[in-house]
Amino acid sequence: MKIRIGHGFDVHKFGEARPLILCGVEVPYETGLVAHSDGDVVLHAISDAILGAMALGDIGKHFPDTDAAYKGADSRVLLRHCYALARAKGFELGNLDVTIIAQAPKMAPHIEDMRQVLAADLNADIADINVKATTTEKLGFTGRKEGIAVEAVVLLSRQ
């Protein structure tokens, strides 16, 4: 069995007059995230983790923000594309662990919906998908409610 581990990290600042979308789930909040795509910072970190595990670069390489084709892009489509690249090489998801770092909004009411979306998009058992949230105790840009940061770790395996 061959195993690969990938780590992804992404940050977006608040400021767009659009819905806040995290893991493909609309989270009620006063503002959305600034981004070329739909701004789903969680799916961007997960996509980077998958691409990293496969040594395929990052989402900026695959979906450049200089390409108008990706303006407002649905990050779920981007995630599924990244996972399809791994599957094409015979790899399947072992597990996914995500940490959302944000002072606001509160994530707890939305975590299970996020896990369901991820399990569906990655064709995985929900038991293999973990999403958790934390704050920085009001320190730094996330603590000042200026944006959201996300870390994602993925394990992929091939029999």
UniProtKB/Swiss-Prot annotation:
It comes from Shewanella sp. (strain ANA-3). Pathway: Isoprenoid biosynthesis; isopentenyl diphosphate biosynthesis via DXP pathway; isopentenyl diphosphate from 1-deoxy-D-xylulose 5-phosphate: step 4/6. It catalyses: 4-CDP-2-C-methyl-D-erythritol 2-phosphate = 2-C-methyl-D-erythritol 2,4-cyclic diphosphate + CMP. This is 2-C-methyl-D-erythritol 2,4-cyclodiphosphate synthase. A divalent metal cation binds at residues 10, 12, 44. Belongs to the IspF family. Keywords: Isoprene biosynthesis, Lyase, Metal-binding. Involved in the biosynthesis of isopentenyl diphosphate (IPP) and dimethylallyl diphosphate (DMAPP), two major building blocks of isoprenoid compounds. Catalyzes the conversion of 4-diphosphocytidyl-2-C-methyl-D-erythritol 2-phosphate (CDP-ME2P) to 2-C-methyl-D-erythritol 2,4-cyclodiphosphate (ME-CPP) with a corresponding release of cytidine 5-monophosphate (CMP). GO terms for biological process: isopentenyl diphosphate biosynthetic process, methylerythritol 4-phosphate pathway; terpenoid biosynthetic process. Transmembrane segments: none annotated. 4-CDP-2-C-methyl-D-erythritol 2-phosphate binds at residues 10-12, 36-37, 58-60, 63-67, 102-108, 134-137, 141, 144. Its EC number is 4.6.1.12. CDD domains: MECDP_synthase (cd00554). Its cofactor is a divalent metal cation. InterPro entries: MECDP_synthase, MECDP_synthase_CS, MECDP_synthase_sf.
